Amino acid sequence: MSNYVVAMEAAWLVRDVENSDDAIGVAVSEAGKRLNDQDLDYVEVEAGVTGCPACGEGLDAAFLAANTALVGLVLELTVFNADSDEHAQRIAKSEVGGALRDVPLEVIDVIEDGDAPAEEA
């Protein structure tokens, strides 16, 4: 059994904001609060980055229209003692998905973590 770092992308809707910086701040704060309420404080929440289609430069993953924003968040956690990367993905989606109901989640990266010590079962 191995440990895996699983990164997921979440689409977070924020209402009544006037700019993308505010939207990102609200999205990160709300997601963090919902995760912490479920004792998932080990999940790291960051604003996502998307590439400019013209130049490839990284831009904040936030789209704002009519004072409503769709913010892309990156959620990252370490899954201990998983049988495979697919197993780690299922565990991560189950843990985070339970706390963030009605929030679309997609696994974007899974890395086997050889540095973290395996927890005893």
Curated annotation (Swiss-Prot):
Signal sequence, renumbered to the chain: none
Domain of life the protein comes from: Archaea
Pfam families to which the protein is assigned, alphabetical: DUF555
InterPro entries, A to Z: UPF0212 (IPR007564)
Matching HAMAP family: UPF0212
Entry's family note: Belongs to the UPF0212 family.
Protein name: UPF0212 protein VNG_0879C
Originating species: Halobacterium salinarum (strain ATCC 700922 / JCM 11081 / NRC-1)
